A protein has these predicted regions:
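N-terminal positively charged helical leader segments and presequences
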Residues: 1-104
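Glycine- and other small-residue-rich loops at beta-strand/loop junctions that grip anionic moieties
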Residues: 20, 44, 118-119, 144, ...
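Amphipathic alpha-helical repeat scaffolds
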Residues: 24, 121-128, 173
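Basic, flexible Lys/Arg- and Gly-enriched helix-loop patches that mediate nucleic-acid binding at interfaces
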Residues: 93-95, 99-109, 121, 130, ...
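Histidine/lysine/aspartate-rich catalytic loop segments that bind and position anionic ligands
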Residues: 139-189
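Conserved small/polar residues in nucleotide/adenosyl-binding loops
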Residues: 189-196
Length: 197
């Protein structure tokens, strides 16, 4: 019986899951149970179902962003049109911690070069940033948990493979992270793009 479970775990994901979209109550519960890296979970607005409540609670406990969305939004994201009121967006690779990025730089005897992004919501832009950061020799990229694109299939494709090489960490609060890094002696350079009117 154990061999069958191991084989089942290694089966290729259906196309919908391979691109990071996990649909349906049981599929999302199982993804949470095995520790799949999930960027965000959408739950149908106004649903009071016990199972959806369990999913939301478990996701929040794991630090995953839970968003209530109307059914039209869920239908728009859905690949199977059988989402049962819940869709998880899984990352194409695991996130790391900021500490692990800093440790890797220290092990190499190099001052850490980090690219910190805030509110990069377009996955194509994040993919391009990952590609550029990897080419520039950055030790890692840091993004916020909210108001940012995650490590989706679109980001992976746009990064031209860089997502497989550059570590990416997610943090709850970018300003707090920058203060902590400054206390550790980090120097920061900032680029702001202001909207044109």
């Amino acid at each position: 019986m154990k061999d069958m479970k191991d084989t089942a775990r290694r089966r290729p994901l259906p196309d919908a899951e391979a691109d990071g979209v996990i649909e349906g109550r049981n599929a999302v519960i199982e993804a949470l149970r095995v520790g799949t890296a999930i960027d965000k979970i959408y739950i149908a607005k106004g649903e009071t179902d016990k199972t959806l409540g369990h999913i939301a609670s478990r996701a929040r406990d794991a630090g995953i962003v839970v968003v209530e969305a109307d059914r039209r939004k869920l239908d728009g994201i859905s690949r199977t049109h059988a989402h049962q009121g819940v869709i998880a967006l899984a990352a194409v690779r695991e996130y790391v911690t900021v500490e692990s990025i800093l440790s890797a730089a220290a092990e190499r005897g190099e001052p850490p070069l980090l690219v910190v992004c805030d509110e990069i919501s377009d996955p194509h832009n994040l993919g391009a940033i990952l590609r550029t950061a990897e080419c520039a020799g950055a030790h890692g990229v840091i993004i916020p948990k909210r108001r940012s694109a995650g490590l989706t299939a679109v980001v992976a494709k746009t990064s031209a493979g860089a997502v497989s090489y550059i570590p990416v960490a997610r943090v709850a609060n970018i300003p707090s992270l920058l203060k902590d890094l400054k206390k550790q002696g980090a120097v920061s350079y900032t680029h702001l793009t202001l909207p044109t009117t």
